[in-house]
Amino acid sequence: MKDISDKRVNISLDNPSITFDKNKCDECSICKNICKFNVGVYGFSKDDYPCINCGSCTLACPNKCLSEKDETDKLEEYLHSNKVIVMQTAPAVRVSLGEEFGMKLGTNVEGKMITALRTIGADYVFDTTFGADLTVMEEASELVNRIKTSKKLPMFTSCCPSWVKFCEMFYPEYLDNLSTCKSPISMMGSVINNYFCKINNLKREDIISIVIVPCTSKKMEILRYNDIDLAITTRELAKYLKKEKINLAKLKNSSYNSLLGKGSSGGIIFGTSGGVMEATLREVYHILYKRYPKGRLLNFKSIRGTSNVKEAVVKINGTHIKVAIINGTGDARKVIEKIKNKEVYYDFIEVMTCEGGCISGGGQPRVFPLNKNLKNKRMNALYKSDKRMKIRCASMNPDIKDIYDNFFGEVGSDISLKYLHTKHRNEE
């Protein structure tokens, strides 16, 4: 029998990302309002269980009756297998995980996190920012080609799986406007399986591929491509570390494995709203000018922050590119309706389901209230890392140059299209 209520979000039993405990629910409707007004899903679908897996409801629920699908038992099972454990960590996790261990908001625990993952059994720990650099290389080229041919504009980013599912559910006529690029974690998953395994004389079945993410919808995303075995949220990782009596705050720092390389600082800011846009525009500048940007594109303040919709016009080598950054799929709905009515025009649009981007993802530590001060501290920690690094553009990264020279050949090659791109589907 279906358990449907008009006072809360309704979560199906087979939801791959989110679970619901009815016994804890007092039907306060906070989750419903978040899903309706911020996420733009509740009340817009005829489905009994409409969900884009973002997990915003899990952060808003004061009773914790909504939560991520806990897969720490599966994590433990994998860690005790006889297979090679390969992990990757998304950018936003490093500036939020410390909160679960009493550290100050926005503390960057990258080195301690890597040590913790090796302590619990990871054989290799890679940085998802390398996958973000791959995304930038492919997406910047895709954008330049679309602008030159005036086809399939505006181009929307495709890094956020909840936004992609939102588009598939409600605006299938715009699926061709989505970038065909996979997200950074999915690009990394594909590269681990098809490049890392090859150069290490491993078969896909010899490894367990695990990603640590700020986002519940990554649990849904990995089911689409089968390149990754398990997606563990920041909250789940903290829970498992505490179970193993590992105090993150007391660990020493260590570094990512270098075989797949570390990403540029542009990959780091993928974890915050506007970061995908900023990193991509840096590479667009490089493509059109044949040199690397300085000034504004390395500190693009007008597209940073947590405002619902941000706009800018960028002039690069005579080409004017009008861009928008959207915080929340609820606002994406409003902007798309304006585009349909020809009230506004853009060339490139970044959409993140969660306000502030991945730093506010549905798998992040629960902090009440989840206010702008918290988001800004996490966000600023990522921008601080961006500012202090020397390699700030994807194509400046020597490891990116190596993988294109040794495996992909060139941006947009047949091999790139096979492993780094995808086709979006109609969910109607």
What does each model-found stretch correspond to?
Residues 68-428:
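Iron-sulfur-associated redox domains of electron-transfer enzymes in respiratory
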Residues 2-13, 17-20, 24-73:
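Iron-sulfur cluster-binding cysteine motifs and their immediate structural context
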